Amino acid sequence: MTDFDTKKLNKKWTIEDSISTYGIDKWGEKYFSINSEGNISISPDNKSQKKIDLFKLVKEFKSREINTPLIIRFNDILKDRIAELNNAFSQAIETYDYKNIYKGVFPIKCNQQRNVLEKIIEYGDRWNFGLEVGSKSELLIGLSILENQKSLLICNGYKDKKYIETAILARKLGKHPIIVIEQRDEVKRIIEAVKDLKATPILGIRSKLSSKSSGRWSKSVGDNSKFGLSIPEIMLTIKELKEANLINEMMLLHFHVGSQISDISVIKDALQEASQIFVELSKLGAPMKYIDVGGGLGIDFDGTKMSSNTSTNYSLQNYANDVIATVKDSCEVNNIQHPIIISESGRAIISHCSVLIFNILGTSHVSSQVKVSDQKKQSLIITNLIETLNQIKNLRDKKEDLSEIIELWNDAKKFKEDCLVAFRLGFICLEERAYAEELTWACAKEIANQLENNEIIHPDLSEITDTLASTYYANLSVFKSIPDTWAINQVFPIIPIHRHLEEPFCKGHFADLTCDSDGKLNNFIDNGKIKSLLNLHPPEKNNDYLIGIFMAGAYQEALGNFHNLFGNTNVIHIDINEDNSYKIKNIIKENSKSEILELLDYSSDNLVESIRVNTESAINNKTLTIQEARKLIDQIETSLRKSSYLSE
């Protein structure tokens, strides 16, 4: 019997069981589902019949020597997300008879990859979709790839004089940059730049709202927020712009109430406050034309549609309706022309289109099999543990309440602690300690088997599940590919991409390749709650066990680092054809070890030469043969050209 044989597969396991276990029917929306073969299926929208089998896709990539870990970017999903956002605002504008338009922008910081931004511009062109930049580097990207002169380029972030001058001069190229004043000292720089260049900008102002936010980033807004002007600072800025004859260039109000806002009431409150500020700025003589509602449009990571860190209590259409209706009401009450609505919705656009796939390298787990000790005379601790295990087994066919099981489990834990103390003092040997641990695990497994049908586990017994959990070793760096799970405990949908016709009877979590205890994935979505273990299958010999992390297209690639020198993974951009085939549009190859070392100023040639010199010394000292030296150098040179991740 193998370590995973403690429970036989349930032959009646169905796809519906897998759907219920992983909740993919909730968080998967129209994009992700399980097909009749038990594999994850990708659909770009609900209007066409296009579908692609994710597991088969990854296997085909492997045949092309494009190995895991890898990111697959589905261009069709990105296209659909952009259309969904723009259509939602179009519908709201029609419903509320709004007398202006919506012009969205994508915040480059969410995903700066060139292939991503080019697709966003391509797919958004029909709506004059623009970009938002937050640094001089991002400004250069925006100016170089945004060709549509009707598209907006919102200029946020800290701005020195060069940033401001670049944005002002870009207007002469036919671009449409709007410089958003976020710090008081930017006003002086803008005035100086206008005088020096004898050119005028389009200006906006970012307000710090008093409205409270919700979710993980709720503390990033308000009086102590990093960006924006207080109301007194806004009044002073308006005064200075009037004195500099620049008030006629002030056309935009911007605000931001945090990312991934979970509660729609927060958005409504912020909109009401901001709309009134917009009205007042108009009354002060600024020809206000735009209101930028910032980011914050959340996505539903767990599918519960509730206000939480992993969900939202509103839909995309709810959001658009509230933005349009609130701004309209404030303007009409004050006889102000309806402004152009701008939003900076990054996460909602880019998250769904990227799927991160990794393979499992191996597992470790607690064995419930007890090996008979060779010790002729057993210590009292061992005897007590054997007796406890037998007492637990004797409860199998009895209907006592849980109190007896709890008592016996506490006894087993106490005997194990006694064993550790005895070992420290030298009273028992290493073999006896190993035997005691095996007996304790066997007690835990026996209790787990007896309680497997209990829907609610007593708190005193809940630790047993963690005790018996398996660790699945992932060919992945958490710090490189999915850093938000480590940095802010963000929870993403994680699910095997195949074998959904089999029962995932193992409970486990993931450990990554890095030599860091934080390199793990142990928070998983569970119907609105977070659980520490995921239902998984036992890996099969000679077959990859493939896991997908979904809805992780925002921020992760930009925030990832080279911890332990694990580099970028392969990234493949694909289009799904009408016949359910696919076309690879772009392949961004993973970093080789040589490329990673070069980033840290290590020359691969120098590295090889240094080792070669060492081999010469070893040959002279007769500790290494010439053949061994050649083999070592060959392996090092080959390794430098290969991936930093593990391969077969």
Swiss-Prot record:
Transferase among keywords: no
Binding-site positions, substrate: I291, D292, V293, G294, G295, G296, L297, G298, I299, D300, F301
Cofactor section: Mg(2+); pyridoxal 5'-phosphate
GO terms of molecular function: arginine decarboxylase activity; metal ion binding
Record carries keyword Magnesium: yes
InterPro entries the record matches: Ala_racemase/Decarboxylase_C (IPR009006), Arg_decarb_HB (IPR040634), Arg_decarbox_C (IPR041128), Arg_decrbxlase (IPR002985), De-COase2_CS (IPR022657), De-COase2_N (IPR022644), De-COase2_pyr-phos_BS (IPR022653), Orn/DAP/Arg_de-COase (IPR000183)
GO biological process, one term: spermidine biosynthetic process
EC nos: 4.1.1.19
Alphabetical keyword list: Decarboxylase, Lyase, Magnesium, Metal-binding, Polyamine biosynthesis, Pyridoxal phosphate, Spermidine biosynthesis
Catalysed reactions, as listed in the record: L-arginine + H(+) = agmatine + CO2
Entry superkingdom: Bacteria
Record function comment: Catalyzes the biosynthesis of agmatine from arginine.
Protein name: Biosynthetic arginine decarboxylase
